[in-house]
């Protein structure tokens, strides 16, 4: 079964409540109709109900009546959510009046619903920047226990089935933290492993990437990767993780055996952790374009409950897939 089909099947089996705060956006509406038709998730659309109804009628969408539609300007829990936000941000000086204004912002409203237990995850970004999507998530939902660093992982589905997990590789960070320190890099590794388990459904074998393998080069950047490996092992002693490894030593069995003999990860890695954002971002785009891989994501990780960000150039299928991914993350978050 293809990865997307697996994600959809798991989501259907344990339906999660996913908020789409850009509820009047055309691609979002079309994806929502497909999601509801297929039973992938219980959707909460935030937006003007009349506008959503008109869009549904104009596009001939038959399943949107299954969604919960919330008007951000007029709904029963508006005051309760405002009080919750004011409490959460009291140390930052937020007043109740300021909170009442922010609650009318769909991105804030969706995150407050998650915090209050009224929803399980959120997906946005068709109309908003990554910063717009992340800001309320970090202010309201906050990072996961023991995690201070948010990052983004990409699923790369390649035709090179001899590498990774039958051609599937998870790569992080590709989206959020430009120059992680050793502690942050360790957290990126741990969170990328969790994404591999929760979303890809695979047992992670994590390689901490570098231009050096096991001391073949000396540099402060290599030292940071080695330190991050030690921290990651303390955070997750049971995790299969090794480094520092060059990309070929991480992926190619013969090279891994030669350069890092005795490693249970070298030559068999299915999770690749880049030492800095520019490396991860450039690498995944090269694999996608030159290697004709399918790139799915980025999948935000490190937040206590799933909030994901779309590209503003996304298509209907991208939104459909990311809802399924967000639902799988929500299932995993509840199980932790």
Model segments located where?
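Anion-binding alpha/beta catalytic cores of soluble intermediary-metabolism enzymes, centered on
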Residues: 1-266, 271-336
